[in-house]
């Protein structure tokens, strides 16, 4: 494989480098050392050529209503099939993954965004929450609804962060 191909593959394995290339804010020499795929000057040249082929980094606002719902908990949703209570809980679950459901009755806060949301919007929100050092307990997106579950004390900050993230979601 060529150095250029190795460099592109290394960039794709490190999305933050890819975003920085698209945004035009990358220190090429530092990135070349970080990627460690060959001689620094040659990798710098490969990065510059790759950057020329990439679309510019752009964001767009998403129209969504962001709300907060307190008193949620994560529960094992594998109760006996057909029992009325379990069926009701499953229908009321905000999020269900791998047999665990986010339902009423706990100390978590769910932040919901409804409207123009998708996986890219969720990724943007999760990136910003990670930078803000807000631990996310659970998150998901489906059918124009995004949900992020956090500890109760992090709820208000999470609302603000999600709203801010939705105001500038990176384009593909």
Residue ranges and their predicted role:
Residues 6, 48-172:
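A conserved regulatory-domain signal marking ACT and ACT-like small-molecule sensing domains
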């Amino acid at each position: 494989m060529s150095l250029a191909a190795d460099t592109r593959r290394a960039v794709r394995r490190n999305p933050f480098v890819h975003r920085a290339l698209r945004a035009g804010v990358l220190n090429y020499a530092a990135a070349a050392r970080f990627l460690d795929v060959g001689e620094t000057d040659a990798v710098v040249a490969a990065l510059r050529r790759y950057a020329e082929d990439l679309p510019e980094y752009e964001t767009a606002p998403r129209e969504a209503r962001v709300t907060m719902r307190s008193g949620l908990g994560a529960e094992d949703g594998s109760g006996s099939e057909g029992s009325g209570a379990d069926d009701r809980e499953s229908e009321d679950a905000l999020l269900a993954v791998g047999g665990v459901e986010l339902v009423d009755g706990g100390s978590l806060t769910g932040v919901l965004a409804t409207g123009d949301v998708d996986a890219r919007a969720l990724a943007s929100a999760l990136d910003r929450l990670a930078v803000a050092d807000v631990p996310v307990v659970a998150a998901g997106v489906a059918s124009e609804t995004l949900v992020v579950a956090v500890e109760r004390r992090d709820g208000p900050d999470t609302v603000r962060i999600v709203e801010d993230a939705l105001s500038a979601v990176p384009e593909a």
